[in-house]
C-alpha cells in the first residue's frame, strides 16, 4: 500500500475528526493490535499521527509481510510482537488491547462479521476498532481480478461492525485522490 501512496491517506485517517477522538487515550503503555499487519504501514501511520509509541502486536498470514513489518516498525514501538497466524483465531486473551486496527484485510475474509467478532473479543471495554476496506466500485471490480478481494458499501461496513455488538459505529470515506473513491473506513467502540 505504501507504493500506492496509502501511507499519506492512512495519516489523514488517523488525524481525522472521525477517528482521532477515539485514540486520545493512547500512550507508550498502550497495547495496539494490527490484524493483517502486512508491511506495517497502517500501524506506522497510527504511531506517527497519534500515539508516537506504543506496544504493537501484529498478525499476518504471510511471513514475507511480517518481515517487511519488522523493518517498518522495529524502531517505532515501545515493543513489537509480530506473529504469523490467522486473524480469525487470534492468539491473544480476551480484552487484551487498547485499540485494534486493520487495513484491507476484511475484503479477503469469507465471513467478515465473524472476523470482526474475533477482533472485538481482544478489545478492552471502551476501546476502538478502526479499519479500512476497499469500497464497492468499478475500480474494486478491476482490482478483484488480481487480488480476489470484495468491496463493501458504507452501509455494509457499518452493519458488520454493529453485528459484532460494537457501539458508536461510524463508516466514512477518507483520504485524497484515488483513495477517496476506493477506500472506506469505520470505527466502533466495544461496550463497557
For each predicted feature, which ranges?
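Acceptor-substrate binding/catalytic loop of class I
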Residues: 141-156
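Conserved class I S-adenosyl-L-methionine
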Residues: 1-27, 41, 45
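Short catalytic micro-motifs in class I SAM-dependent methyltransferases
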Residues: 104-105
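A short glycine-rich, Lys/Arg-flanked "PGG" loop and its adjoining helix->strand segment in the class I
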Residues: 113-125
Amino acid at each position: 500500500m505504501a507504493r500506492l501512496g496509502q501511507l499519506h491517506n492512512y495519516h489523514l485517517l488517523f488525524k481525522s475528526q472521525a477517528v482521532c477522538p477515539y485514540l486520545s487515550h493512547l500512550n507508550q503503555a498502550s497495547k495496539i493490535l494490527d490484524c493483517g499487519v502486512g508491511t506495517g504501514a497502517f500501524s506506522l501511520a497510527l504511531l506517527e499521527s497519534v500515539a508516537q509509541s506504543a506496544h504493537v502486536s501484529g498478525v499476518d498470514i504471510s511471513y514475507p509481510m511480517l518481515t517487511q513489518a519488522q523493518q517498518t516498525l522495529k524502531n517505532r514501538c515501545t515493543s513489537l510482537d509480530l506473529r504469523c497466524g490467522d486473524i480469525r483465531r487470534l492468539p491473544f486473551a480476551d480484552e487484551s488491547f487498547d485499540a485494534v486496527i486493520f487495513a484491507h484485510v476484511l475484503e479477503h475474509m469469507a465471513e467478515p462479521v465473524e472476523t470482526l467478532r474475533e477482533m472485538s473479543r481482544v478489545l478492552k471495554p471502551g476501546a476502538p476498532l478502526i479499519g479500512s476496506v476497499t469500497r464497492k466500485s468499478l475500480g474494486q471490480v478491476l482490482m478483484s481480478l488480481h487480488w480476489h478481494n470484495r468491496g463493501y458499501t458504507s452501509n455494509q461496513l457499518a452493519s458488520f461492525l454493529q453485528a459484532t455488538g460494537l457501539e458508536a459505529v461510524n463508516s466514512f470515506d477518507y483520504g485524497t485522490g484515488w483513495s477517496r473513491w476506493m477506500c472506506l473506513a469505520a470505527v466502533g467502540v466495544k461496550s463497557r
